[in-house]
Amino acid sequence: MVQPAYVGSRGFTSITALARTQWVDLEGAPETTTISFDTPIGKNDNMGIGLSLFTDKIGPTAENRITIDYAFAINFIWSKLTFGLKAGINEFEIDYNRLNIADDNDPLVQYNANKIQPRFGLGIYFNTEEYYLGISAPNILETNYYDELNIENTSFSNVSDRIHFYGMAGYVFDLTPKIKVKPATLVKIVKGAPLQLSLIHI
């Protein structure tokens, strides 16, 4: 979940699972699995907690992540402002045995790139009965994966997990008393990459 302030905002317990496999039957094909849980807590459901599990495998690399989200809402007459925190652990590893090594003396092969890093994120979410908007950064701690290897002035010396910023906004249209349409926009900003814009209809 990219917006920690959203946990528990739906007013009921939610469990979501997603599994995605690309290029089936191809060795080293990307595989992604996510499982998330969130629920409202507190006397007036003004708080929420969530738990997310994430695994991603591509070729010789694997990434495992577990995060906990907490949200606290301030209720107004016609709206609600929610602040969210995210904390967790991320594990990144490379299995060089799955590669065809041309040079056993390659310094990159001799380097243990396996890393366990903390994650910490923030989010703000504002919503009414008609519209909502929010901003978040799921992880504000940058990770340099090859910082301990003396390979300056190479492409590997710049391999890092940079901070991702997300902006979201949406509006609720009542088509009938029982049917609602929720078009939304999600913007993703990362330093050094083009701005990404997604339109979502719910």
What spans do the regions from the language model cover?
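Subset of outer-membrane beta-barrel
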Residues: 1-201
